[in-house]
């Protein structure tokens, strides 16, 4: 069974900052993204990994397709990807724009996924 701790709980702030520094140094055209299942989610499976290096030209719809495929979801299964646990962004937005406006102080871009919309509710990640 996967760990119940979030990425932020498993790694100190300093470790995360160093992770991002190394990632950006070695992969300057990749965006460091952490994608975790919403803590109250029961229907969708847990991803096999949480850390993703996403090419900076990819838009949100492509990222959603990638995550849906990794989760092996069928076309009629609902799936919502929330940036910083609270905001949905336009599917046409490039990930590099989302990163610039929404990245955490540690340098990672955090997202959670859920099977239901959670508008008006701040999700803790």
Swiss-Prot record:
GO terms for molecular function: microtubule binding; phosphatidylethanolamine binding; ubiquitin protein ligase binding. It comes from the Eukaryota. Its main location: membrane. One of its GO terms (cellular component) is autophagosome membrane. A lipid is attached at residue 120 (Phosphatidylserine amidated glycine). The keyword Oxidoreductase does not apply. The precursor molecule is cleaved by ATG4 (ATG4A, ATG4B, ATG4C or ATG4D) to expose the glycine at the C-terminus and form the cytosolic form, LC3-I. The processed form is then activated by APG7L/ATG7, transferred to ATG3 and conjugated to phosphatidylethanolamine (PE) phospholipid to form the membrane-bound form, LC3-II. During non-canonical autophagy, the processed form is conjugated to phosphatidylserine (PS) phospholipid. ATG4 proteins also mediate the delipidation of PE-conjugated forms. SUPFAM superfamilies: Ubiquitin-like. A lipid is attached at residue 120 (Phosphatidylethanolamine amidated glycine). Ubiquitin-like modifier involved in formation of autophagosomal vacuoles (autophagosomes). Plays a role in mitophagy which contributes to regulate mitochondrial quantity and quality by eliminating the mitochondria to a basal level to fulfill cellular energy requirements and preventing excess ROS production. This is Microtubule-associated protein 1 light chain 3 beta. The lineage of its organism: Eukaryota, Metazoa, Chordata, Craniata, Vertebrata. The gene is MAP1LC3B.
């Amino acid at each position: 069974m996967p760990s119940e701790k979030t990425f932020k709980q498993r790694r100190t702030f300093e470790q995360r900052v160093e992770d991002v520094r190394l990632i950006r140094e070695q992969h300057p055209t990749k965006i460091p993204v952490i994608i975790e299942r919403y803590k109250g989610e029961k229907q969708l499976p847990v991803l096999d990994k949480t850390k993703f290096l996403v090419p900076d030209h990819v838009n949100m719809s492509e990222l959603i397709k990638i995550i849906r495929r990794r989760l092996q979801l069928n076309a009629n299964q609902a799936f919502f990807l929330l940036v910083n646990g609270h905001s949905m962004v336009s599917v046409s937005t490039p990930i590099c724009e989302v990163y610039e406006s929404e990245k955490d102080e540690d340098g990672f871009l955090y997202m959670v996924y859920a099977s239901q919309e959670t508008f008006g509710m701040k999700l803790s990640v």
